Amino acid sequence: MVELESQEAVTVASTADIAVDVSLRLLAAATSLASAVVVAANHQQRWGVRVDFTLFQVWIGFVAVNLVCTVYAAATAAAARKAMGRWWLHHADAVVVNLEAAATAGAGAIGSIAMWGNEASGWYAVCRLYRRYCNAGAAALALSLAAVLLLGVACARSRYPKMPPTT
């Protein structure tokens, strides 16, 4: 068969391309799930006052978004061969990356106020009293940031997809 110059050559995804995509998505799912579990299991009691994630709406949203991100990343990893090259994949990736980034930024903002306080508004740094709780929150934020970066790379790779190999 003779190809004309005006015809575009179809690039086919190799097994390595699919493996990289699946690996990125599974790592994102694992880090996002770990972040949600760390926050949900995190609590500390001092002087009869128990602090856990249900006291702050931003942490409840953070856990919910991380669980949604986990399910999405695992589902797209499982269906990577079929989903690769679909027009909707990049858009769905972008939505999930932005949700994860927004949840991480919101929780990080509350975490920074808890860590350093805000004299102008009269908010005191509570991490001096609840150090273990704040350290676990910081670890969860780091894990969530890793999930954002991993999904961001997967999103960038889905922007110019190669077609899955035909079997």
Swiss-Prot record:
Keyword Zinc: no
Membrane topology: Multi-pass membrane protein
Entry-linked InterPro entries: CASP/CASPL, CASP_dom, CASPL
Subunit (UniProt): Homodimer and heterodimers.
Sequence ranges on the Extracellular membrane side: 39-54, 116-135
Organism encoding this protein: Oryza sativa subsp. indica (Rice)
Signal sequence, renumbered to the chain: none
Topological domain ranges for the Cytoplasmic compartment: 1-17, 76-94, 157-167
Family note: Belongs to the Casparian strip membrane proteins (CASP) family.
Residue ranges crossing the lipid bilayer per the database entry: 18-38, 55-75, 95-115, 136-156
UniProt keywords, alphabetically: Cell membrane, Membrane, Transmembrane, Transmembrane helix
PANTHER family named among the record's database cross-references: CASP-LIKE PROTEIN 1U1 (PTHR36488:SF8)
Pfam entry (one): CASP_dom
GO CC annotation terms, alphabetical: plasma membrane
UniProt protein name: CASP-like protein UU1
Localization per Swiss-Prot or TrEMBL: Cell membrane
